[in-house]
Regions:
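Glycine-rich portal/gate segments that line the openings of hydrophobic small-molecule binding cavities
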Residues: 29, 34-76
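Beta-strand/loop substructures that line and gate deep hydrophobic ligand-binding cavities in soluble
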Residues: 72-123
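Hydrophobic pocket/interface hotspot
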Residues: 17-21, 27, 45, 59, ...
Length: 130
């Protein structure tokens, strides 16, 4: 299952964004409304939103072209990527991309909430760095 957020322009360089995305604490600022729990770890974070189960993410490779977050739960096979494309010294195009391997029943249950989550993340990032 692949989901995409809309492309946005962020008023930060791709290096500045990559530096932000390396730190688990910074992800709290990107979380949608309804955040009920947020815990950081050395290599990631766990969060809970109202009406959804808690999700633990591990921060993987972070470069000036993107950041890859993967599930910290080995039984869930998915990744969330922030794809970054430098436009100028102080502007970057960003897009959230989700890729997950789920059975058809789970896919049917999670597809809409995940798309809403990706849209909310995109909106928050855009609002923070206009």
């Amino acid at each position: 299952m692949n989901l995409e957020g809309r492309k946005i322009i962020v008023n930060k360089s791709s290096k500045e964004l990559a530096d932000l995305l390396k730190s688990p604490e910074n992800y709290k600022d990107f979380m949608p409304d309804g955040l009920q729990k947020f815990e950081t770890r050395e290599d990631g974070f766990k969060f809970g939103l109202k009406g959804m189960p808690e999700i633990a993410l591990k921060i993987g490779e972070v470069t000036e072209s993107g950041a890859v977050l993967t599930s910290a739960n080995p039984s869930l096979d998915f990744s969330l990527t922030a794809a970054l494309q430098s436009i100028s010294d102080n502007q970057t195009e960003a897009q959230m991309l989700f890729e997950g391997k789920f059975n058809p029943f789970i896919k049917m249950m999670v597809e809409k909430p995940l798309q809403n989550f990706i849209n909310s993340l995109t909106d928050k990032i855009e609002a923070l760095y206009k």
